[in-house]
């Protein structure tokens, strides 16, 4: 094809190094199927496969940037900093942050049993435990729609997509339907930032596709994920510094 698509996918039927050939030969078909389940009956299909593809897409500009052995320009930063987070690390982080916040305020052994990488709290000294109990009491007042999760370096949205699944379990635990929960998760719970425009677009797509797994009409509801590309900021206000704990007063 003699157009822009050739720059994106140089398709060949004979070249073994062709991207399409590598996709077909190198990635198991089940990894493209979001309905695939593992030996435990849990969802294992990879909506996140686009993250792997995007990392591959950035390989050439990344190699060029490193090969010149010069200072990395701000335009090159997205390519050289792309690193896909393995699935088990994503699960560990989400289950022991978002998941922990919920079950510490709303104890549920059945819910915890769904999280392979969840770790129970270690034994603490009495004074520490008393403070933790106060925090758990605050968690007990939380409703699912109150919780905010942000990935400030979201890449193609791998963490956000798994967080969506955990949020869905939390909502169902609280009595919500999957359809209503999917809408609320996009509107109230999940936020993401990245310096790469393309990564932000992929995250937007990945989150919507995950939502569609639970609400097949989500694309017609006019709901947009809270994911954004932010390359640089021109300033920060005193109020913003206060919000992020810089220790400033009003005077």
Tell me what each language-model feature is:
Residues 1, 5, 14, 55-58, ...:
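Compositionally biased, intrinsically disordered low-complexity regions enriched in proline and serine
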Residues 20, 26, 64-67, 103:
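Non-catalytic substrate-recognition/targeting regions of SAM-dependent transferases
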Residues 69-251:
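SAM-dependent methyltransferase catalytic region
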Residues 29, 33, 37, 59, ...:
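General structural signal for alpha-helix termini and helix-helix connectors
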């Amino acid at each position: 094809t003699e157009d822009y698509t050739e720059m994106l996918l140089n398709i060949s039927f004979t070249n073994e190094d062709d991207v399409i050939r590598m996709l077909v030969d190198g990635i198991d078909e089940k990894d493209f199927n979001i309905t695939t389940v593992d030996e435990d009956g849990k969802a294992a299909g990879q909506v996140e496969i686009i993250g792997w593809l995007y990392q591959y897409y950035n390989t050439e500009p990344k190699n060029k940037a490193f090969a010149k052995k010069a200072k990395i320009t701000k335009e090159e930063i997205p390519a050289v900093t792309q690193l896909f987070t393995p699935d088990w690390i994503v699960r560990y982080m989400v289950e022991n942050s978002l998941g922990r916040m919920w079950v510490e305020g709303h104890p549920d052994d059945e819910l915890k049993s769904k999280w392979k990488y969840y770790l129970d709290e270690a034994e603490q000294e009495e004074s520490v435990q008393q403070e933790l109990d106060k925090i758990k009491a605050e968690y007990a007042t939380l409703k699912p729609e109150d919780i905010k999760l942000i990935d400030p370096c979201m890449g193609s949205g791998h963490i956000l997509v798994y967080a969506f699944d955990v949020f869905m379990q939390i909502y169902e635990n609280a009595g919500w339907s999957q359809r209503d929960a999917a809408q609320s998760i996009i509107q109230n719970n999940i936020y993401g930032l990245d310096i790469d425009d393309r990564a932000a677009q992929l995250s937007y797509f990945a989150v919507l596709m995950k939502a569609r797994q639970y609400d097949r009409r989500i694309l017609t509801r006019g709901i947009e994920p809270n994911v954004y590309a932010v390359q640089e900021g021109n300033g920060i206000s005193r109020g913003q510094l206060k919000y992020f704990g810089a220790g400033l007063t009003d005077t």
